[in-house]
């Protein structure tokens, strides 16, 4: 399995995970899922508030659904 956990990675629910990092003075997040041994990057954004914004999480979920339909 993947060695995932805080403080760098947080499970947001279902199959969606969030990688946390900083880019200069900005807080950056990348939402991803795993398919076997592959990490699938779904959406990245600069975070401006404490909680992951709903539209960003929804976009990642939609992209994961599209991927699974293939």
Regions found by a protein language model. Name each.
Residues 1-27, 36-39, 46-70:
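Basic, Lys/Arg-enriched alpha-helical interface segments
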């Amino acid at each position: 399995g993947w060695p995932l956990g805080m403080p760098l990675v947080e499970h947001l629910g279902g199959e969606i995970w969030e990688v946390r990092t900083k880019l200069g003075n900005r807080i950056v997040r990348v939402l991803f899922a795993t398919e076997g041994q592959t990490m699938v990057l779904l959406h990245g954004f600069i975070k401006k508030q404490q909680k992951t914004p709903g539209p960003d999480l929804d976009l990642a979920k939609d992209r994961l659904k599209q991927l699974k339909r293939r």
